[in-house]
């Protein structure tokens, strides 16, 4: 493998950031693959996602020039490249997007000039190989390319509305049907005449000759609902350039999979799968998917059967299936991680830090899927063999998904390789039939949202609740109901009240929202039943008006329920101590996956791969209580994000942090946290774990209580201990020894009982042999055996079969009014003429029972009564009829 040294992927990445740093840009880290505070988006799929609120006017940033390298994923939802990965030159699930941004600072001139400078001077691309496109009415960009940069007119292409509507063009970008939008200019690289394909805008534009490198978007308009464009007061620049695609050009290779980064991964995949041909497409799939899976796990996604976890699971299983195609039958995929870290760990230190967690998660998924893949492939082959029209029925695809864990994408992938397809409509119909009725919407308020237009007119809510639980002069700035915005509300109405300031904590970070009251001097009273955060910055008081009325502009006083807030604070601080203890006991792979901090309990979900033993549970509980008794001062500081991380503070998955963060320190625990806490750890009083369980693959859950709730739990447990001691005639101090003696005695009695049963069966066998009836040289035994359970009955049957070479046997064990039936057919004379399952059905129906089995053995049951005797007495006659 010849890996170029001048423009390695790593160097291209650092060149880009250094270039824009020197142009006055602040370099920001990649946002997580899971978007913060954006439920509409499954994954971060472009560089602009983390700045979406800035463009919408819902967030303001202090810096006006920003550059980054954004990790992106396109493997689910609207933006899904999964099916194409491995089969095309440039499709990936995971990719890196280089981007520079201007928020009301520089505009077209600088963006175009710097893009050209970086491409031609830093990366030395020949200018004659570059071609640019502009929106057909964007004369300003056209002139800048021609007059300032010097691009010949025959290499500047105007692109019109080529998507069937006004301003619907490859060169006109818009976030949605309304809102920020504007023209864009794209830079293409010309691979030369020897590669098929035409320039952008031509009939041959889909060929591989001209490859898009960089897209510069100029957001200068606000699109109205009637389609008109209104100039934005502060135009913005949003650019994006795919790192892998650029690396292929700078390294003089044709496909992204030939660049240095991918070649290293492909060689490792070839080594793990023992494949000599490194051009094998399956190696490309494995290499690509190793990046997507590792970064998803690092960003807190774990395999599951829904949402983002399901997407991760199907990517993993697609990689494993390609390994299976190459003949691999043992876990291998997790061993891609060290090589991935070697090529990307310097740029993304979080990858190195989470190496153990990533490998263990992948290994667990490999072991789980190996159990079903072989069986699932056999079923697929059976289905495919019966298909005449090349379409796999949706019902069969659903059966593979529902029973064997095959994502339908995987089934479709296999089908496509065989020239077939899946009936997706039929699959969706089966899914709809299977899916349970969606849960009713939660309590009022959670589905109500604030429009972006209205949010842009408001300032973020000022939170007063760290220092005070009661506040006056809270001005109502917005009212929302199920119908949306409203100007006023009256008695009995349920509304969400937004005020300019508030002492009420809004639910976030797992901590429940505050409750309490909002009041006015004229007697108006609202009962606040919850507080929710809207758009990440507005506190919405979910309330019911119990007296008077309220309107926008009113001034209220607010009082938080003090006792409840204190109990919540106890549990929140205890959660921090628990998190710290878990990482101390199990290692740094332990990361919070979710939490609930309520007044009566806390729930903490965390990454770990095996159940916690009783000894470990005791150790964790003791460590937390040691910190409680140490009575540490809970220190809270505001500092810059990077300074906080440098100080060892833990940032939690799924949380969105600003430039300045709140750091909560208690003892050895240091976390970024916006929640409410106690003053000293001693305020917790007592910490007690009440349960531990697994909630999904690689995720455990601990539930615990603190303070008075913990004391009440201990007292209740003690009361149960005394009750148990009383039931066995012991005392609390000696109850364990007493129970051990009782269980030992029980085991002794059970062994003695088994011996007695054996003797009883031996005697019974002798009696049964003596009562056997000869029917056409076949011995027929039909008998009632009182006191024998199913196990003893089968043992008696097996002993009889050993002593009767040709026999038909029916035994009825009777205990407590219930009958257990077993039948057997043994030997060449009876086999083929008498069937055990048919005989059992004949007997069982006479005693209101049923059963089933094979031709040589069957079992079932029924009810005791007079009919049992007649049923058994008739067996010999029934056998005789069938033998003849």
Swiss-Prot record:
GO terms for biological process: alanyl-tRNA aminoacylation; negative regulation of DNA-templated transcription. It is an enzyme of class 6 (ligase). Its cofactor is Zn(2+). It catalyses: tRNA(Ala) + L-alanine + ATP = L-alanyl-tRNA(Ala) + AMP + diphosphate. It is found in: Cytoplasm. Binds 1 zinc ion per subunit. InterPro entries: aa-tRNA-synth_II/BPL/LPL (IPR045864), Ala-tRNA-lgiase_IIc (IPR002318), Ala-tRNA-ligase_IIc_anticod-bd (IPR018162), Ala-tRNA-synth_IIc_core (IPR018165), Ala-tRNA-synth_IIc_N (IPR018164), Ala-tRNA_ligase (IPR050058), Ala_tRNA_ligase_euk/bac (IPR023033), DHHA1_dom (IPR003156). Its main location: cytoplasm. Its EC number is 6.1.1.7. Consists of three domains; the N-terminal catalytic domain, the editing domain and the C-terminal C-Ala domain. The editing domain removes incorrectly charged amino acids, while the C-Ala domain, along with tRNA(Ala), serves as a bridge to cooperatively bring together the editing and aminoacylation centers thus stimulating deacylation of misacylated tRNAs. Belongs to the class-II aminoacyl-tRNA synthetase family. PANTHER family: ALANINE--TRNA LIGASE, CYTOPLASMIC, ALANYL-TRNA SYNTHETASE. This is Alanine--tRNA ligase.
């Amino acid at each position: 493998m010849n890996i170029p040294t001048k423009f390695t992927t790593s160097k291209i990445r650092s060149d880009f950031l250094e270039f824009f740093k020197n142009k006055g840009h602040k370099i920001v880290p990649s946002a997580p693959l899971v978007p913060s505070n954006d439920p509409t988006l499954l994954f971060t799929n472009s560089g602009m996602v983390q700045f979406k609120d800035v463009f919408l006017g819902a967030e303001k940033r202090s810096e006006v020039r920003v550059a980054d390298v954004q990790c992106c994923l396109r493997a689910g939802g609207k933006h899904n490249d999964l099916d194409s990965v491995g089969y095309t030159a440039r499709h990936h699930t995971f990719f890196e997007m280089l981007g520079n941004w201007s928020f009301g600072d520089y505009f077209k001139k600088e963006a175009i000039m710097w893009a050209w400078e970086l491409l031609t001077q830093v990366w030395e691309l020949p200018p004659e190989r570059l071609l640019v496109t502009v929106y057909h009415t964007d004369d300003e960009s056209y002139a800048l390319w021609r007059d300032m940069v010097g691009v010949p007119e025959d290499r500047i292409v105007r692109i019109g509305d080529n998507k069937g509507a006004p301003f619907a063009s490859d060169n006109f970008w818009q976030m949605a049907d309304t809102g920020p939008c504007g023209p864009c200019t794209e830079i293409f690289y010309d691979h030369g005449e020897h590669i098929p394909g035409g320039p952008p805008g031509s009939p041959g534009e889909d060929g591989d000759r001209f490859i898009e490198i960089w897209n510069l978007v100029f957001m200068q308009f606000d699109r109205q609902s009637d389609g008109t464009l209104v100039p934005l007061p502060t135009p913005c620049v949003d650019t994006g350039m795919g790192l892998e695609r650029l690396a292929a050009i700078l390294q003089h290779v044709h496909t992204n999979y030939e660049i240095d980064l991918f070649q290293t991964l492909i060689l490792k995949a070839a080594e793990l799968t023992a494949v000599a041909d490194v051009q094998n497409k399956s190696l490309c799939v494995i290499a690509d998917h190793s990046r997507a899976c590792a970064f998803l796990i690092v960003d807190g996604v774990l395999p599951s059967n829904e949402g983002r976890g399901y997407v991760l699971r199907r990517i993993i299983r697609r990689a494993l299936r390609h390994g299976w195609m190459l003949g691999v039958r043992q876990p291998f995929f997790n061993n891609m991680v060290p090589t991935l870290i070697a090529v990307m760990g310097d740029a993304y230190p979080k990858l190195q830090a989470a190496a153990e967690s990533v490998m263990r998660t992948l290994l667990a998924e490999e072991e789980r899927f190996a159990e079903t893949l072989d069986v699932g492939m056999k079923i697929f082959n059976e289905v495919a063999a019966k298909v005449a029209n090349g379409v796999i029925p949706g019902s069969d695809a659903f059966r593979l998904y529902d029973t064997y864990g095959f994502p339908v994408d995987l089934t479709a992938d296999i089908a496509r390789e065989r020239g077939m397809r899946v009936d997706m409509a039929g699959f969706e119909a089966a899914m709809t039939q299977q899916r349970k009725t969606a849960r009713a919407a939660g309590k009022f308020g959670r589905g109500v949202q604030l429009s972006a237009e209205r949010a842009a007119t408001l300032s973020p809510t000022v939170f007063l609740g760290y220092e005070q639980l009661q506040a006056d002069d809270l001005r109502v700035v917005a009212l929302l109901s199920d119908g949306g915005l409203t100007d006023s509300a009256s008695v009995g109405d349920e509304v969400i009240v937004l005020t300019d300031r508030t002492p009420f904590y809004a639910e976030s970070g797992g901590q429940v929202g505050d409750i309490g009251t909002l009041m006015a001097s004229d007697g108006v009273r609202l009962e606040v039943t919850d507080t929710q955060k809207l758009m990440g910055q507005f506190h919405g008081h979910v309330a019911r008006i119990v007296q008077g009325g309220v309107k926008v502009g009113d001034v209220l006083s607010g009082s938080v329920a003090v006792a409840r807030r204190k109990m919540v604070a106890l549990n929140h601080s205890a959660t921090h101590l628990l998190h710290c203890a878990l990482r101390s006991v199990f290692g740094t792979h332990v990361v919070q996956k979710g939490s609930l901090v309520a007044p009566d309990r806390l729930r903490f979900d965390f990454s770990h791969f095996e159940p916690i033993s009783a000894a470990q549970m005791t150790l964790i509980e003791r460590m937390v209580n040691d910190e409680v008794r140490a009575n540490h001062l809970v220190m809270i500081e505001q500092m810059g994000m990077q300074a906080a991380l440098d100080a060892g503070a833990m940032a939690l998955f799924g949380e969105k942090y600003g430039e300045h963060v709140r750091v909560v320190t208690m003892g050895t625990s240091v976390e970024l946290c916006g929640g409410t806490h106690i003053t000293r750890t001693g305020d917790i009083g007592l910490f007690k774990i009440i349960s531990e369980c697994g909630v999904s693959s690689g995720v455990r859950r601990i539930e615990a209580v603190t303070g008075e709730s913990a004391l009440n739990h201990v007292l209740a447990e003690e009361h149960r201990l005394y009750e148990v001691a009383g039931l066995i005639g012991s005392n609390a101090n000696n109850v364990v020894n007493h129970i051990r003696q009782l269980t030992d005695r029980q085991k002794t009695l059970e062994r003695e009982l088994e011996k007695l049963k054996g003797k009883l069966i031996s005697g019974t066998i002798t009696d049964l042999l003596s009562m056997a009836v000869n029917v056409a040289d076949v011995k027929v035994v039909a008998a009632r055996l009182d006191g024998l359970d199913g196990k003893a009955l089968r043992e008696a049957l097996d002993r009889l079969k050993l002593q009767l070479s040709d026999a038909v046997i029916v035994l009825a064990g009777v205990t407590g009014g219930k009958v257990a039936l077993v039948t057997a057919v043994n030997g060449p004379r009876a086999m083929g003429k008498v069937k055990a399952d048919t005989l059992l059905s004949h007997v069982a129906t006479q005693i209101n029972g049923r059963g089933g089995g094979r031709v040589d053995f069957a079992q079932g049951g029924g009810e005791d009564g007079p009919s049992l005797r007649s049923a058994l007495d008739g067996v010999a006659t029934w056998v005789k009829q069938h033998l003849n």
